[in-house]
Structure formats: structure tokens, C-alpha cells
Amino acid sequence: LLIAKYPVTIFRREPTDADLADSSVCVVDVGGDWNEDLMNFDHHQFPRDSDPLCAISLVLKHFGLYEDAHKFCDWLEVAEWFDTRGPVDTGKWLGIERETLSKLNSPIDITLLRRFAGGTEHNTGQPIWEVMKMVGEDLHQYLTGMKAKLEEVARLCEWWDMGFGKKVLFMPRVEPLSDDASSGMGRFVNDSDFSEETVALVYPDRRGTGYGMSRFNDDKRLEFTKVGEEDDVHFAHAKGFIAKTSATEKARLKELLEQSWVG
């Protein structure tokens, strides 16, 4: 996040007193000080029983994005716990064994962390620096754009009451429609009063003129392979969780959903 905003060299070392007192130097995850005016973002000095806040928490607070990040980024609270409480307590908090956490490790994460830790200086143009910048840019764009995306979903979408007694959220095709407007539909449902009743999402297919249909929260009471042989369905995943159709009429889309319901 910081290098996306300030594209400068990263030095991996302990800060000097001069660094900590210089607001033109961002000191992150070291130094024993949290002072946004001086651009110091360390959490290690906090009491053991304090709320789990790590360096990214403090940087997000600095940018005014922390509350939105907690709402829209499911991984953030887990990262805070892992960084401040360790894997054993984090596993207990999640209700899983520590060994299960280890099985979720990504080799991409491992390599990036190892390569970052292996250098004392990272500069513009180097792979690690550029990847870090991309992550910061994408996170900032995601957080600042999510509110607008949810507003777009609320403005465009409509709820369908299905014959099988559940709800479906439908987004019509309108122009202009942002490329990823449908990606906010799941979050919109979770924030609505109908999250327990909703079983599917229907949204414009970005690769065609029809619509995509997918399970909400992987509700297996919908089985889209049941409509895979329909003339206007050109794709139905073998696992049954998604289908794509050239149909554009609401009545036909509802018919396909009714056919896919297995209860």
C-alpha cells in the first residue's frame, strides 16, 4: 500500500532514531513506534492483551481504509491474528488445528516472503518490488471501488421470488455496465436481509450476450447440470455450480433456474 502511494526504495534494516523522527521515511513493522504523523507503523510495542493489530492494520488506518478492509477483506482479521497471536492461537480462534493452517500455505506466498527477506534493498523494476506495488494498487483499488460497486448493484439488481420458495438476485444487462459489477453481488446479498433465502445469482455474461447463473454460497440444492442439454445453455460446469446461457428473457432465465432446483 505504501509503495503504491510512494514508489521509493525499500530498505530492510532496523531504523535509526533519525529515521523514526523523519516523516519523509516510512518505518514499517520495526522501530517500536506507531505515529502516523511521523509515518511510523510498528505494532510490536502493543500490550499482549491488546486488540490484534499488525502493520498492515496501521497502514490501512492511515489511509482511512481500515473499516472498509475489515468489512470487505475476509483475510484481514486472520492475518492480524496470525501476526500478533501466532499459529496456535489463530487455529484455536478459527476452530481448526495448527496443521490445517499449514496445509493452506501457498508456495507463491512462501517464495515471495523468502525472496523479500533475502534482500536488504528492493528497488523499482525488481520483481519483488513490482509485485508488492501491484498488490498495494489492487488492494487500494478494490477497497475504494467496493462501495461504488455495491451502490451499482443496489441500483441495478432485483430480487426474484422463485416457485421453489427461495430468492435469486438478478442483475440486468445495461449500458454502460462496469466490467466487474457482478463481483459485488455476493457481498450485497451477505449485507442484505435475504442472505439466508438467496440461492443463486444471475448476471450478464462478460463473454457473450446472455447471462451467467451461479449458486450463492455453493448451495447444492441448485444443480445446473440438469439444464446442460438445453439448446440455449452453452456451458454447464460438471460440478453443477455454474451455467451460461444465451437466453436473455427473464421468464426463460427463471425457467432454467426452476429446472435446476433439486431441493
What are these regions (language model features)?
Residues E121-F188:
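Active-site rim beta-loop-alpha module in soluble metabolic enzymes
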Residues E152-E158, F194-L201:
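Short small/polar-residue motifs
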